[in-house]
């Protein structure tokens, strides 16, 4: 790409020691004080796989964090292990929320903890139902009916259980059975509980939603329940169900009241938990907004910055296009890492994707093979499309609202002295752990040596194994006098 004159972005030469900053490229260092810059701190980073989004944007952001609260979504545990000691030394409270292996983290998330009103119940149900909509061809009638049924079951659990968790709601759904009466209306094993609630308050929220379901014809009710059950099964894995029983719960107010770093680990290859993670983000934004509204100045005491790696992979965050429009006034900001604008539009739709882009005052383009994205960048930067498509590896274009585009190189994180120290200490810890594992393995007999994958697989099979009676025991269980029911069935 031909060299072009660049205009200064008014990048300050010096900042006070220990001030939060944003490093967005070689020589591109900015304050995060919105009052000074006049801009919001929302950043959209676009680059193909391997373009350096994480190492050149995310890791420098963590390096330059001293007083802001951080919510960092990662698929690579190395980042978590690498930066926890650094942030702890700076006085950060570390929260580790691992959706892949919940027991590995030090905190859990239960959506039931944030129910403060009947409106919250409805929001939770709608978020769960809509989270899987992208993977289905939904009929809004079935989704709305399933949400109404889920409203009833959540409310019933909250009203009748001591210290309820979402695991209790899931157990209620799992145990629910439906049958029909002589008039073809629905009967279930929960009818008595809802009659009891109705006797206490005929207009209570749980019974009102339950009547909507129980007055349906049995076949229609069966379809509604099937819709809900399939969504629940695809959203809440056995690992998540275990997490709901963990004692230490996440409280979003902590992010706003003290300097906190929350690391969220998801899987890059397991899409089954994506809808639940989207629910988590929706709940987090809602809780932080509500908490900010309760403050005298309408803002969070501590600014909260969300770093969302692979933001456009998985399921859309409910209402995110609305949230991002008002993040700044609550002292909340986001860094969204995506591979292309097309990817964002395919997840959120063209209108919502445009809203998200327009509410990011900073845009970092690090190269992509996506033609539509390159065309937009070509128009925005006023340079030929050919130059965009042929951008050298390691180069980038930085857009800041109110300034001309800045053409330069991505930030060389490995040349940062503090990062070199972080990396050095991390490698020492990894090497020490490796030596310990080698010692343990060397003490085992050769026939007991299995790789990690085999051990995990074997442990899982042992955990779920159910001993099945032998064929003889099945045969012996039928007496000579009794008819062979199975044989009769097959004859029919």
Give the label of every model feature segment.
Residues 3-8, 16, 20-332, 383, ...:
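P-loop NTPase motor domains
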Residues 52, 64, 271, 363, ...:
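A broad, structure-centric signal for solvent-exposed, well-ordered loop/edge residues
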Residues 368, 421-422, 430-433:
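Short, intrinsically disordered/low-complexity patches at protein termini
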Residues 167, 245, 297-298, 344, ...:
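Flexible domain-boundary/linker segments
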Residues 275-276, 347, 375-378, 408-412, ...:
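Short conserved micro-motifs at the rims of enzyme active sites and ligand-binding pockets
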């Amino acid at each position: 790409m031909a060299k072009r004159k660049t205009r200064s972005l008014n990048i300050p030469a010096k900042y006070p020691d220990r001030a939060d900053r944003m490093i967005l490229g070689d020589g591109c260092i900015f304050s995060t004080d919105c009052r000074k810059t006049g801009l919001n701190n929302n950043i959209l980073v676009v680059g193909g796989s391997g373009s350096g989004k994480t190492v050149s944007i995310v890791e420098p952001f963590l390096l330059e964090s001293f007083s802001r609260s951080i919510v960092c979504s990662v698929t690579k545990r190395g980042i978590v292990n690498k930066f926890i000691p650094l942030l702890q030394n700076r006085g950060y409270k570390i929260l580790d929320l691992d959706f892949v292996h919940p027991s590995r983290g030090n905190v859990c998330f239960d959506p039931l903890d944030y129910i403060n009103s009947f409106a919250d119940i409805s929001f939770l149900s709608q978020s769960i139902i809509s989270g899987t909509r992208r993977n289905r061809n939904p009929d809004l009638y079935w989704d709305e009916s399933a949400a109404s049924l889920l409203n009833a079951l959540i409310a019933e659990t909250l009203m009748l259980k001591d210290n309820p968790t979402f695991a209790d709601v899931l157990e209620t759904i799992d145990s629910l059975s439906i049958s029909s009466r002589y008039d073809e209306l629905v009967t279930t094993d929960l009818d008595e509980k809802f009659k009891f609630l109705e006797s206490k308050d005929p207009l209570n929220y749980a019974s009102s939603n339950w009547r909507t379901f129980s007055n349906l014809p049995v076949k229609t009710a069966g379809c509604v329940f099937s819709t809900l059950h399939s969504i629940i099964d695809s959203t809440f894995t056995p690992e998540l169900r275990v997490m709901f029983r963990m004692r230490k719960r996440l409280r979003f107010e902590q992010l706003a009241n003290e300097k906190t770093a929350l690391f969220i680990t998801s899987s890059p290859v397991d899409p089954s938990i994506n809808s639940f993670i989207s629910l988590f983000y929706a709940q987090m934004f809602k809780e932080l907004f509500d908490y900010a509204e309760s403050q005298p100045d309408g803002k969070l005491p501590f600014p909260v910055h969300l770093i969302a790696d692979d933001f456009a992979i998985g399921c859309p965050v409910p209402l995110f296009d609305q949230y991002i429009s008002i993040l700044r006034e609550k002292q909340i900001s986001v860094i969204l890492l995506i591979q292309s604008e097309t990817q964002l539009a395919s997840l959120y739709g063209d209108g919502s994707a445009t809203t998200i882009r327009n509410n990011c005052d900073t845009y970092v383009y690090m190269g992509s093979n996506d033609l539509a994205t390159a065309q937009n960048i070509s128009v925005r930067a006023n340079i030929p499309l050919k130059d965009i498509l042929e951008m050298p590896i390691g180069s980038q274009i930085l857009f800041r609202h109110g300034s001309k585009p800045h053409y330069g190189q991505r930030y060389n994180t490995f040349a940062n002295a503090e990062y070199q120290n972080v990396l050095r200490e991390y490698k020492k810890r990894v090497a020490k752990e490796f030596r310990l594992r080698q010692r343990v393995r060397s003490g085992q007999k050769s026939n007991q040596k299995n790789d990690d994958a085999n051990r995990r697989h074997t442990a899982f099979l042992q955990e779920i194994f159910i001993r099945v009676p032998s064929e003889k025991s099945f045969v012996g269980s039928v007496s000579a006098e009794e008819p062979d029911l199975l044989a009769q069935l097959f004859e029919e």
